[in-house]
């Protein structure tokens, strides 16, 4: 399980160094093989260990190519999916087209989200967090049943 937000740097070749606390888990569970794709709802990337991505691919394969919405989701997620192998130094190369989509330059937030990571431009991440907090403070209390059961 991945959790927390960590500031990492992209080098001049577009590689990011995976924090040490995740490396062993990624090597053990995915042999360092990852898949990166775009988030179709936010200006960030989604980074999955290969076994987790294969579950997503199975679900995508069950969607209908005759349904325009389902086909669009398939096209966006699969069409942007890029395999990346963690190297011996614990780095992942993020494809240029993906970096461009998320506006990633040098400072990147690696955000753990259970079975995957999100990759955000640092400034965009902080803006998103502020927007999310502001939205929650303005919320009228219409919580889903699952959120009503969540006690912090």
Swiss-Prot record:
Entry's family note: Belongs to the MraZ family.
Protein name: Transcriptional regulator MraZ
Conditions for induction: Negatively autoregulated.
Gene Ontology terms describing biological process: negative regulation of DNA-templated transcription; negative regulation of DNA-templated transcription initiation
InterPro entries: MraZ (IPR003444), MraZ_C (IPR035644), MraZ_dom (IPR020603), MraZ_N (IPR035642), MraZ_sf (IPR038619), SpoVT-AbrB_dom (IPR007159), SpoVT-AbrB_sf (IPR037914)
This protein's UniProt keywords: Cytoplasm, DNA-binding, Repeat, Repressor, Transcription, Transcription regulation
Assembly information from the UniProt record: Dodecamer.
Subcellular location: Cytoplasm, Nucleoid
Lineage of the species this protein comes from: Bacteria, Pseudomonadati, Pseudomonadota, Gammaproteobacteria, Enterobacterales
PANTHER family reported in the protein's UniProt record: TRANSCRIPTIONAL REGULATOR MRAZ
Role of this protein: Negatively regulates its own expression and that of the subsequent genes in the proximal part of the division and cell wall (dcw) gene cluster. Acts by binding directly to DNA. May also regulate the expression of genes outside the dcw cluster.
Pfam families: MraZ
Domain SpoVT-AbrB: 5-52, 81-124
Gene Ontology CC annotations of this record: cytoplasm; nucleoid
Disruption-associated phenotype: Mutants have no detectable phenotype under standard laboratory conditions. They are more resistant to trimethoprim than wild-type cells.
Note: Overproduction is lethal and perturbs cell division. It destabilizes the divisome, but does not affect FtsZ levels or prevent Z ring assembly. Co-overproduction of RsmH (MraW) protects the cell from the toxic effects of MraZ overproduction.
UniProt-recorded Gene Ontology molecular function terms: DNA-binding transcription factor activity; sequence-specific DNA binding; transcription cis-regulatory region binding
